[in-house]
Amino acid sequence: MSEEEKVKLEQEEYSADSIQVLEGLEAVRKRPSMYIGDVNTDGLHHLVYEVVDNSIDEALAGYCNHIQVCINEDNSITVRDNGRGIPTAQHAKENKSALEVVLTVLHAGGKFNKDSYKVSGGLHGVGVSCVNALSDKLVAEIYREGKIWRQEFCKGCPQGDVEIMGETDRTGTTITFKPDASIFYVTEFKYDTLATRLRELAYLNKGIRLSLTDKREVDPETNQPRHEVFYSEYGLKEFVEFIDASREKLIENTIDINTEKNGIPIEVALHYNTSFTENVFSYVNNINTKEGGTHLAGFRRGVTQTLKNYADTTGMLSKLKFDISGDDFREGLTAVISVKVQEPQFEGQTKTKLGNTEVGAAVSQAVSAALANYLEEHPKDAKAIVDKVILAATARHAARKARDLVQRKSVLSGSGLPGKLADCADNDPANCEIFLVEGDSAGGSAKQGRDRQFQAILPLRGKILNVEKAMRHRVYESDKIVMIFKALGITPGTEEDSMGVNLDKIRYHKIIIMSDADVDGAHIATLIMTLFFRHMKSVIEQGYLYIATPPLYLVKKGKEQRYCWNEEERLRLIQEWGGGKESSLHIQRYKGLGEMNPEQLWETTMAPEGRTLRQVSIENAAEADRIFSMLMGDDVPPRRQFIEQNATYATIDT
């Protein structure tokens, strides 16, 4: 078959009749959260991901290698690819153009036809029709069969038939949409959120070039908008090296696996470092499976069994006096798993847990075979890994003793609550909140200013242990950390997960970090967040962790006074009240919480009706892990580079 005949056949396979329709679109505008998760920031950005996923599907099928995303000046989004273009011919069953079917009927598209796409991305799979339904305006431009086709929509309804606008020698699809402000609470796109996802997609789909442009932000020197290109030649290998950039390597090489088992394409990259945590990130059809699933279980089984067999065969574990667990084999392991599954079955609370049993066996076999070969060919690396396993097992044994001591103390000391804790009267965790307050003096003001019915105060003197650099038993031996565990009512480690916590015993559903608005305060808050991220991640995942935002300034003019939370507010108030002259106003800079009296602290930072809390969330686990490792680890150059890049956002006291 000639190349020309092959292209013609492919065009015929992806035609109007290959678009399958499964259900209507009526409910999307009434219940948007059912389709995109929520109508806040996550749901807003999910619209972009749905459109990009369509282009990625074209790339996976081999017809697209360049995807451009642009945030326009009016906060609309344009996604452009160089694929085949959505079919525009008349759809046999629907009696309208295939383009209109794709954009107005939920679950309509080539991804539901195996002849068009073998695998398809997108968690909810609702496609661009959902984006159309939730957009004030959407314009589709199709470059296909030598012509430019265009159709415009408003709130999901076509504003006319598809029209031919001209001729072209290119192919592809361009979708421009503006989210409906009557549906979304937030309509401003975050550059960094989109950049993180596009970078992730570039690593997961090597050889595809993705770009992001922000026309809202123009460089005054070059007069060019903010722009970034994401491209990975080596895929997951580069992804793991990016995540581990600030960690010290245990072995030099990243083990790269790219194979197919039982018809399932499997890609895995893994690397060992000197840290004390396991960081494994799993994906199915480009979807981040946050809850894991059979592919993750298969990977862990493959790593554990292969390393144990090697260590037993070489006699390296013969002198160890206690058992080794699977966790020990994976301490210091960073890995990314990506599988492509034709019919994925998702389970779990957020539908991000893979349930296909056949995938687990396939991944386990692939990892076992590749890792066994690597260990045989690299005995020096194999010894370094097994030595690390022995060290991890020894530390875990010590950690269990320390953890048991924490748990036993809690039982023997009655309520087990620390003496410094000023508890609240209410016993219902859903109503209660606890402030983790920097310093005893600020803790005193907070105790006096709080509402004793539902607000508890735990003062923390000085900095807590940096858990990023500490072995697990050191964490459980730290008095300050034990005090936090006891105050929250939870104990580290469960039967199912040594790194888990018994969240059903938690005493507060709002845990609020309250530290000074200076560099030391920010450092203390970061140390506490690192503790939660590494040892109580489920607290963050449940949405229980917050950061208080005390004001930076109190500005007075006569009898009038106003608080300012940042430098911009202060300058604006100087202009408004003082005509630009700071000398005509009395400005007090709060360097510490202790400088505020109890009434001021209550009014600005603690009163539910007047305060601003920032909820700590994990938008992207791999990115969060990389940043915590960089900020709190030993490697200085990446941290310096991060600070230099973000220096404009920091408030430095002199």
Which functions belong to the PLM regions below?
Residues 91-92, 99:
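Short adenine-binding "F-helix/F-box" segment of the Bergerat
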